């Protein structure tokens, strides 16, 4: 564009001169002018070419600078990793995740690489997809938790034995934050497995992402239908009786974009056991977990909704205590008893109303409660709705916090009004108190977990990264100034809770 502009200016300037020459010399002078114009045009073209060449050189230099910056970043990350490793005196493994500079978000997962090192040796390497997870924790906690999928090089799901766990593709890195003992989830999952109820396997790791040390994490299995997790049949069109995994919860992650009609359905009963009316302000929502909301077929929805409806109708009926006509026809009572005791021993403030899973196998499979999930604000680590007190029943949440947005289903108060169910609780409590639920056994677990973290320096490095000892983090009831303080509070709370339950269970 500039070349044409210059050419026109020159022509306009020279045309008057052409009109002044004599006819005799006209041809010679016109030829001379043409040569001058050609020379000027050549110069202008050369200038433009020079500019293009210069711009190309600038682009090349910019790319070189970008490459050098990436190399510098990689070296800095390596130095950080080296510094972190030199500060470690740990027999526990360390996970290193590299996203190539991409930011980890909540949906969709981004591609990354994962290495597990132990004693500075790489023992595993995987391609992964990674995203943020959790609802409340994402909003309130600086230390994030992550959902992982192990992938092949094309980005497709790949089952692997991550960390020595049974082969699967879906994993979670839980970052304890408000729980400053770092063990509440691990403790209750261990107790569940110890009494024969599957809960996610757990292992402590340290985590570094893109060269930044993130502290102590727990590698966990995501709740899924799998022979090594929730061992139920895959539902199909030939047999729609199971298996199913359902949950009672609020929406999180991608589920926030869906209505309850897409994700699940609402109970016909309110939390107090009355049939809902248009004026009912409180409701219980059942969400599809397996098959999930995107995959479940209409006939499968109809089947499992009707099964839950029949169970609730039987439980709400006058014949609910009858072995044949009542609720026992639909549920595995022993699993309900164990689920109840695990939630009560920890006084989980979310018990029965959030992160509450239950499942049904095919054919004549009944409804089973579990696996348990998300206990980081249990064992006295909640300052609302009496979650901090070691006395009181968790299942009576509705009487304490009736205005809360998510209440406990009527199931539990109704079950606890049946002498048969109460008898099963007393029997199981008495059995477990001599074994896995004995005060000595539970406190030994607490001490073993603490020693594991302490001897490997994980408290020191975690709280150097997250300097929150002595600081209130929602929803702390107790704020200890040290790890010793936090564990003293936990041990005292557990002993008080067990003593209260001994008396309370006997009086059911």
PLM region descriptions:
Residues 1-10:
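Bacterial N-terminal signal peptides that target proteins for export
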Residues 19-22:
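C-terminal motif of bacterial Sec signal peptides marking the signal peptidase cleavage site
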Residues 24-84:
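Extended alpha-helical stalk/coiled-coil segments
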Residues 83-182, 187:
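Conserved NTP-binding catalytic cores of kinases and kinase-like/nucleotidyltransferase enzymes
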Residues 92-93, 103, 126-127, 135-137, ...:
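Middle-to-C-terminal accessory/interaction subdomains
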Residues 107-108, 159-162, 184-185, 217-219, ...:
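Short, solvent-exposed loop/turn and secondary-structure capping segments
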Residues 154-155, 166-168, 175, 195-198, ...:
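Internal "kinase-insert"/substrate-recognition segments embedded within catalytic cores
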Residues 195-206, 348:
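Short, well-structured beta-strand/strand-turn elements
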């Amino acid at each position: 564009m500039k070349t044409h502009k210059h050419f026109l200016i020159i022509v306009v300037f020279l045309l008057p001169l052409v009109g002044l020459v004599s006819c005799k010399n006209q041809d010679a002078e016109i030829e001379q002018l043409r040569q001058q114009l050609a020379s000027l045009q050549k110069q202008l073209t050369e200038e433009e070419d020079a500019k293009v060449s210069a711009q190309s050189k600038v682009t090349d230099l910019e790319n070189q600078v970008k490459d050098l910056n990436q190399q510098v970043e990689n070296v800095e990350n390596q130095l950080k990793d080296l510094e972190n490793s030199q500060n470690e005196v740990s027999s526990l493994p360390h996970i290193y995740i590299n996203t190539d500079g991409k930011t980890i978000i909540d949906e969709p997962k981004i591609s990354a690489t994962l290495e597990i090192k132990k004693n500075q040796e790489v023992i595993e390497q995987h391609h992964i997809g990674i995203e943020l997870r959790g609802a409340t924790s994402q909003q309130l906690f600086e230390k994030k938790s992550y959902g992982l999928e192990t992938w092949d090089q094309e980005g497709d799901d790949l089952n692997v034995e991550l960390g020595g766990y049974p082969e699967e593709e879906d994993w979670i890195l839980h970052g304890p934050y408000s729980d400053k003992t770092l063990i509440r989830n691990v403790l209750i999952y261990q107790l569940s497995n110890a009494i024969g109820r599957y809960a996610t396997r757990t292992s402590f790791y340290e985590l570094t992402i893109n060269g930044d040390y993130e502290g102590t994490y727990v590698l966990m299995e995501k709740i899924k239908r799998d022979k090594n997790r929730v061992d139920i049949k895959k539902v199909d069109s030939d047999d729609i009786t199971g298996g199913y995994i359902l949950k009672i919860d609020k929406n999180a992650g991608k589920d926030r974009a869906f209505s309850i009609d897409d994700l699940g359905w609402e109970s016909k009963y309110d939390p107090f056991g009355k049939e809902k009316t248009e004026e009912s302000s409180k409701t219980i929502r059942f969400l599809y977990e397996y098959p999930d909301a995107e995959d479940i077929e209409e006939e499968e929805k109809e089947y499992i909704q009707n099964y839950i409806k029949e169970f609730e109708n039987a439980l709400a009926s006058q014949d609910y205590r009858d072995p044949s006509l009542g609720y026992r026809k639909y549920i595995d009572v022993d699993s309900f008893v164990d689920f109840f005791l695990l939630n009560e021993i920890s006084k989980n403030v979310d018990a029965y109303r959030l992160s509450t899973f239950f499942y049904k196998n095919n054919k004549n499979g009944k409804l089973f409660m579990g696996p348990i999930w998300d206990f980081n604000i249990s064992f006295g680590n909640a300052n609302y709705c009496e979650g901090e007190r070691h006395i009181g029943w968790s299942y009576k949440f509705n009487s304490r916090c009736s205005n809360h947005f998510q209440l406990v289903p009527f199931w539990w108060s109704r079950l606890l009004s049946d002498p048969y169910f109460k008898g099963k609780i007393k029997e199981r409590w008495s059995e477990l108190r001599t074994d896995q639920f004995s005060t000595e056994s539970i406190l030994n677990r607490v001490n073993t977990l603490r020693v594991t973290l302490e001897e490997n320096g994980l408290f020191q490095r975690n709280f150097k990264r997250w300097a929150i000892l002595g600081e209130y983090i929602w929803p702390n009831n107790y704020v200890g100034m040290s790890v010793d303080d936090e564990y003293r509070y936990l041990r005292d709370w557990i002993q008080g809770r067990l003593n209260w339950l001994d008396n309370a269970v006997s009086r059911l």
